[in-house]
Amino acid sequence: MAKVRTAIGECRDCAGLIFDLRGNPGGVGGIASGIAGLLSSSEGSLGTMKMRSTQLKFAFFPQPESFKGPVVIIIDGSSASTSEVFAGGMQEIGRAKIIGETSMGAALPSIFQKLPTGALFQFAIADFKTPKGILVEGRGVIPDLEVRWNRKALLSGHDSQLDAAIKLLQTDK
């Protein structure tokens, strides 16, 4: 989190920020809230995780050094879990535009249980909904602008998804 805070601080005067979450399998949910606080001028929530007997909001609070400019997040079919919490929440609160391809749709927190055979069994322990109450599991985060991965362009040195994100920042001033 310290590296992200430093990077955003160094970009305070930038025209915009791009978060490339393609291929990001997720991580610690609280990090999504921490980053959202560095990009927001008011408090809010990226969504809610509901467990059997309780629920947890992915609340964020504005930080003094928060970035005020436009934000674009690039996702793809391999973006999952916490990256979906971050992208979907930022999209729904209107703080970021999402570009790329629909994410994996695997946003449920889970745990592993070791079986007597030594194998591991993974199972979901909660459900996640975006700020507007949309289930991401099995659906994914749907981009505002769908830009498909283009192998031919990539081989010639052009990343069509990144190019689209840059173009959006240049027109969103």
PLM region spans:
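Alpha/beta-hydrolase-fold serine-hydrolase catalytic core, especially in secreted/extracellular enzymes
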Residues: 136
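Short acidic, Pro/Gly- and aromatic-enriched capping/linker segments at domain boundaries
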Residues: 117, 122-127
